[in-house]
Amino acid sequence: MALNVVILAAGKGTRMRSDLPKVLHPIAHKSMVQHVIDTAHSIGSDAIQLVYGYGADKLQASLGEQQLNWVLQAEQLGTGHAVAQASPYIADNDTVLILYGDVPLIQASTLEALLAARPENGVAILTVNLANPTGYGRIVREQGKVVGIIEQKDANPEQLLINEINTGIMAVPGKQLKTWLSRLSNNNAQGEYYLTDIIAMAHADGVAIDTAQPQSAIEVEGANNRVQLAQLERAYQAREAEKLMLAGANLRDPHRIDIRGEVTVGMDVMIDINVIFEGKVILGNNVTIGAGAILIDCEIADGAEIKPYSIIEGAKLGVAASAGPFARLRPGAELKQDAHIGNFVEVKKAIIGVGSKAGHLAYLGDAIIGDGVNIGAGTITCNYDGANKHLTVIEDNVFVGSDTQLVAPVTIGKGATLGAGSTITRDVGENELVITRVKQKHLLDWKRPVKIKK
C-alpha cells in the first residue's frame, strides 16, 4: 500500500500583505511549504501531490526540480475541492496523507503516529485539545467515537463548547476518499466544499475512524499573517536550540540563537549569544563560538574557536585552530591544526598550515601557506590580474613582514624572510631575506607648506 501525500498550497494569504504566495514565506530561511515537503519525504512518501494556485511561477521557481506532482487548483473553492483536484493521481489502494503548506512545524514522528493509528481501511485524524478552540472545526463524538467534524461557522451552541479541534491533517484510504470527495456539497455558511465533511460520510458508511495527537499544539499551527509567522519562527528556533543542548552544546541564551540549517554538535560545545547557523554546520567536541558569529556550511574540529563577530562560510578549521574576532573565512578556506586568523583578516580558497598565523588586517586569497608561517599586518596576496586568478605558495617557517604585497603567481621558499613594506613579484629562495622597499631619504630643515587664508 503506497503512501500518497497531498499538500495543499494554493492559497494567496491575503493577510500576509505580500505578493509572495503564503506558503513561500520562510521559517528559518526555508519556505513553509519546503519544510512540509521535507517532512513528507522523511516518512517515506511514495508520491507527493502539490496542489497549487496563486503565484504558480514563484512556487515553481522556488521549489525547482523536486519529486513533486504539480496539481492546479484554478479556483479556491475549499479544502475538499483542493484535494479533489489530486484525485486522478490517487490509486484505490493508496493511503492518502493530507498536509498543509502553511503548517511547517509538523514533525515526522507525529505523522508516523497518525499513520500507525489509522485502522485497516479506516480513517485517522490528527486532533488537538485547546483551552480556547474558537475559530477551529470541532471533533464531534458519540459515545467516544468520532462521527463528524463541524466548522465553527456551522456549529450550534452545544458544539461550540467542544475543545477537541480538527487540525486538518488526516490519513484516508484512497478508494473511499475519491468516493467521498465526489459526494461533497457546498451547502454551508461559507459556500465551500469542506474536506471535513468526509468524516461524517465515513461514519455513515461504517468506516472506522481513529485519532492521534501531536506532542505539542505548535506543530499544527499555521501562519496567516506575519505575527503568526514570527511566532512559528520562535517556536522552531526553541525546538532546534533544545536539540543542540540535548546533544551536548551549552547555549549562553537559548532564546538568542538562529538555526537556519542542519547543525551537528559534539560534547561540551559553547555557543554564545546571537550566533547564526546556516546550511550544514558540523562542530566537534569542545568548540567555542563567540557572540555574533555567522557560520555557513562549515566544519569546525575539536577544540577550535570562532571568536566574536566572525563570518565562516564554506570553510574548515582544524583541531585547536582559531578565527577572529571579526575574521572572514570564505569558501575554500582551511585552517590546519593550531592555525590562527585574527581580526579583520579575510581568507579565500587558501590553506593555512599547522601553527601558522595571520593576526590582523590581511587578505589571503588563492594561497597555500605552509606550517609555522607568520603573516604580518597589512599583507595581501595579489591574486587577480584583471582576467585570471593566480596562486601564491608560502612554504614552511616563512616570516612575512607587515604591509607586504605578494604578486601572484609567486612562491616563497622555506625559512625565507620578507621585509616589511615589500612588493614581491618574483620567487624567493629558501632562507633568503628580501627587501624591496624604497631607500629612506632625509631632507633636513624641511618646511611644510603654509595655508593661504582666503
Swiss-Prot record:
Cofactors required: Mg(2+)
Active site, UniProt feature: H360 (proton acceptor)
Purpose of the protein: Catalyzes the last two sequential reactions in the de novo biosynthetic pathway for UDP-N-acetylglucosamine (UDP-GlcNAc). The C-terminal domain catalyzes the transfer of acetyl group from acetyl coenzyme A to glucosamine-1-phosphate (GlcN-1-P) to produce N-acetylglucosamine-1-phosphate (GlcNAc-1-P), which is converted into UDP-GlcNAc by the transfer of uridine 5-monophosphate (from uridine 5-triphosphate), a reaction catalyzed by the N-terminal domain.
Chain spans, region Linker: 227-247
UniProt-annotated binding residues for Mg(2+): D102, N224
GO cellular component: cytoplasm; membrane
Binding, acetyl-CoA: A377, N383, Y384, S402, A420, R437
Protein name per Swiss-Prot or TrEMBL: Bifunctional protein GlmU
Gene: glmU
Pathway: Nucleotide-sugar biosynthesis; UDP-N-acetyl-alpha-D-glucosamine biosynthesis; N-acetyl-alpha-D-glucosamine 1-phosphate from alpha-D-glucosamine 6-phosphate (route II): step 2/2; Nucleotide-sugar biosynthesis; UDP-N-acetyl-alpha-D-glucosamine biosynthesis; UDP-N-acetyl-alpha-D-glucosamine from N-acetyl-alpha-D-glucosamine 1-phosphate: step 1/1; Bacterial outer membrane biogenesis; LPS lipid A biosynthesis
Taxonomic classification: Bacteria, Pseudomonadati, Pseudomonadota, Gammaproteobacteria, Alteromonadales
Region feature (Pyrophosphorylase): 1-226
